Amino acid sequence: MGAVYTFKILKHFDIESKTAIFFTLLLTVGSNWLMTAQNAWVWFIAQNMAFTLSLMAIYYALKNKIGLSLAFWACAVGCRPFQILYLPALLYLIYNAHKAVNPEDKIIDIIKKRYLALIPMAVIALSYMILNFARFGNITEFGHNYLPEFTRSELGQFNIGYMAENLKNMFSVPQTQGGIWQYTYANGMCIFLVSPIFISYLIYIARSIIKHEKFDMKFTLLVLAIAIIELFSITAHKTMGGAHFGNRYTNDILPIIFIGTVILLPKDNDWESFNYPLFFIGLAINLVGSIMFFVQ
């Protein structure tokens, strides 16, 4: 389903089908999402759901479907709380989509006309809060703080003391022995190796600036801010995803990086070919890494 909505987002921008299929593959099987997609552990399921729900929220924001967009966003937050950071980007897309149809409307006009569309989101959020309070006596607690690895930790689940080591792991290649990479079983590895779409996004930003092309600078900066804040936030977590291959917590950022990339894609497919080796590198690393994870 996530791949379907990835393709639908690309087609919304009138990108030809061949290119749309390629970038759908780059985001999915060419990234560390390939690892999480094959695993039925409950936290992997939650992350896969957040991935798809975030893409659905983005798609319906582009289509000016406020109710659906924010409802799916609320569901994504329920799966992965840091998806709450996507809200400014969704509101920006919704605002632009509404203005394309109603150019004279101001923000207050949009609110007056469409406030009822917020009801599904509010109901979903309220249901989460009621459930959390009933189970743990706290509307924001959903059980993670009660896991043994966090209750036994002196610093708890989140602490800035974890950030330095986690940031280092996030940008480090695996250690080598005899010229061969050693398998990284936990705590993450270089995000540019396991999810090369991060490289694609940065290159397309540089391309747009170098060529002095017109692009949505506000949205580009917004996407960068969301990605950076979420990256730093997850590095404050004790485990960075526990046992897995790659760097699965950073997979939560893939949907926002994807829409940021799509916005910057040139209409003439210029520079598309540089993504091909990135895709094959991402596919090979994640395929081999995923197989080794399950056979070890």
Name each model-derived stretch.
Residues M1-Q296:
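Membrane-proximal envelope and lipid/glycan-remodeling enzymes
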